[in-house]
Amino acid sequence: MSAAKSFPLVPQLPHSAAAVRHLVEAALPALGLALTGAQLDALFAYLDLISKWTRVYNLTAVRDPVEMVTHHLLDCLAALAPLAVHLEAARQLERAGPVLTPGLHAGQGSRLLDVGSGAGLPGVVIAICFPDVSVTCVDTVAKKAAFIKQVALTLKLPNLIGLHARVEALAAPGTAPFDVICSRAFASLADFTQWSSGALAPAGVWMAMKGKRPDDEMAALSQDIDVFHVEQLNVPALDAERCIVWMRKRAGLAG
């Protein structure tokens, strides 16, 4: 992933910072990623902000620096290569004809919504690694939305927006829809898709990050929803099952 802009220097991290950074750098090839030094600095600056805010606002239950990397950062980074594949495929379709993909925005990059974003996982990670993607992190908790705004300001991320709202409110007339709506350990697939359906572009997709393959949740989905792929993820240094459930509205029902 490339980025033309520069990020602020990474702040002072705990004594294990060098080892923790090496853990991330060593994991990148297995994740199919090639991040710049500036992007890595931004990711660790972001983790530092989470740590500072968590002391007051309890953004996350994970506080150990190594666990922050394995359970949060690497977990989110594991979703980036699959997301990149989807975005590139969507852009190829867009070049073939805008009628095929009316939800994509030519020349503006894709629009991604992270629902129930909390501390910004995975939304902030996506914004750092994909500077051409406009990322909106929405949460019903004001302090969490305020944190995302602070991250965008501190790390100078013009493609990152923090929004205090219910996701249902984003379906209002005149509101631009999203090409990808993602969530991570947020809600059941049925609730996730129902609540955010109005914000999804006609050719958009849902990207639900889950642990074990949620067969019961998939069986409970509305008939209007098509699960077109369940993608298994391998997260380095994390001995746990992870997957992405990719969904879309069935043909003839979008819009």
What are these regions (language model features)?
Residues 130-254:
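S-adenosylmethionine
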Residues 114-117, 121, 140-143:
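Hydrophobic alpha-helical segments of small multi-pass membrane proteins
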Residues 119-132:
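Conserved SAM-binding loop of SAM-dependent methyltransferases across substrates and taxa
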Residues 99, 107-118:
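Conserved class I S-adenosyl-L-methionine
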Residues 2-107, 143-144, 150-158:
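Class I SAM-dependent transferase core
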